[in-house]
Amino acid sequence: MAMKKEVMSSERLAASLAIPDMTDPKNGIHAINLVVENVNKALRNAYAEAVFEEIRTSPKVPEKENFDDLLFPSDNAGRSSRYTRYVTPDTVLRTHTSAAIPGWLRNAAKGGRLEDTIVVLPGLCYRRDVVDKTHCGELHQMDVWRIRRGNPRFNRPDLIHLVETILGSVVPEYKYRANEVKHPYTINGLEVEVLVNGGWLEILECGEAHPTVLENSGLDSCEYSGLALGMGLDRLVMIVKGVEDIRILRSEDPRIKRQMVNLDKFVVVSDQPATKRVLSYSTSTDKTEEDVCEEIRDELGQEAVYIEEIQYSEMLYEQLPSKARENLGIRPDQ
């Protein structure tokens, strides 16, 4: 079965690219770029012997760079336009900042400048996702890779040290746990979660750079080894500031915006409870949950920021009483 690759409309593309990347101080001081700054300082201090590079790249990337160069299989579900935004049949809005790493590795290998280098790549990523308090379609991410030539080769203790260096710079007082997980472009991978309000929240994934990624980039994997880490900056800021809803980070409310220029604890600006409404929405039976969430956001336009969560509970035409069918104007294929 062919992978679904629907190209996004030019209007949706323009709207996506118009969203400011808050990892970049050029777009104004924000808690997100303050976290990036703290992480960078910690890395420079902890690994003073390594060359440090921060890079930024276009969010529009070839599908090959987003998936193939990072060893994602051709049938990986993430390639589908159910989850990924296609600009053309062969170009996507990056789903992770890791998409730029193989290209950086190739350029570094050609330049012969890789001895011991840490490269960081913060930026905005784009995914088709469901709507809830910890997920959004446009997320801030940051990759941290360290590539070294010769011995000693990087191993699990080195990876844990990198994780703890980053966590110590942002959320030092929080307990974390690391779970074994597989990633296409790493070996000995880990998923790291932080304990927040009695529950575990995933904030980063990491591992040792896959030898094949190094080889395909022009680096001899017998000579080079690496560490790879990608973190969700929005969630880190939520933890630091005590924010429970990811939408708050981009709020235009002046009372909230004033609080987003530092890493102080967030002060709730309203003591009113959330308003709940049950709304019926008719759509074709072949639509996924991600499709429905995106359609609703499109219909609401700027007012979509008021949506806290969409709970998906489907009921087919045949299951509805005749009066409900009449009120909804629903068709048999919906």
Residue ranges and their predicted role:
Residues 2-4, 95-139, 251-264, 301-331:
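Conserved alpha/beta core surface patches that mediate binding of polyanionic ligands
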Residues 1-135, 147, 200, 205-214, ...:
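Class II aminoacyl-tRNA synthetase-like tRNA-binding/catalytic domains
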